[in-house]
Regions:
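Solvent-exposed, flexible loop/coil residues
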Residues: 6, 18-20, 24, 34-35, ...
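Substrate-binding surface in catalytic domains of secreted glycosidases
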Residues: 1-99
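Glycan-binding loop/region signatures in secreted carbohydrate-active enzymes
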Residues: 26, 63-143, 172-173
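Active-site and adjacent substrate-binding regions of carbohydrate-active enzymes
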Residues: 10-13, 125-173
Length: 173
């Protein structure tokens, strides 16, 4: 009912897993993944709002320009660290600029792609990092266009100092 008084409803579809759990996972998965133990994803959030009566065209999809990081991952060989217990909760893991400069493909970190969830993650055998990149943004932009959503928003501008993610959004929206 409240949606009739609102121009848009911004869905903060990030931090879906992280700061409150000692189990690794995607903090902004588009779809549920078998490796992600908690059933939280963009699709489920969007469906929840639509089922509650919010028109699709009023929904704005939120994406993160920062990461979530778990240290001390146990059972590292399984699923490349996804869905595994860790010593720490998934705290702030740095912004996209930091990941590009110091983590992606460096320090022993390998970039993996979860084909079910449609998001990337990094793992070095002990540390798991969930983040957003241009590939996952492309899939989310296609999703929101297909669904007829109202647009996209992000958190936050300063986390993309090179403008790579923002430029990708501008080009593809």
């Amino acid at each position: 009912e409240a949606s009739r008084y609102l121009d848009y409803v911004q869905l903060m579809t990030y931090d879906l897993q992280g700061g409150f759990q000692k189990v690794t996972g995607h903090h902004a998965a588009l779809y549920h993944s078998e490796g992600n133990l908690f059933d939280a994803c963009v699709q489920k959030a969007v469906n929840g709002f639509v089922n509650a009566g919010v028109p699709m065209e009023k929904l704005i999809l939120g994406v993160p320009f920062y990461s979530r990081k778990w240290d001390g991952v146990k059972g590292a060989g399984c699923r490349n660290g996804l869905g595994m217990e860790a010593e720490t909760v998934g705290g702030y893991g740095g912004d996209y600029g930091e990941l590009k400069e110091s983590w992606i493909g460096k320090r022993g970190f390998i970039r993996y792609w979860d084909e079910q969830a449609k998001v990337p993650y990094l793992f070095d055998g002990e540390t798991f990092i969930s983040y957003e990149d241009c590939e996952s943004l492309g899939v989310k932009i296609a999703y929101l266009k297909e669904k007829g959503m109202g647009g996209i928003m992000f958190w936050e501008y300063k986390c993309d100092p090179s403008g790579e993610l923002l430029s990708f959004i501008k080009k593809n929206m």
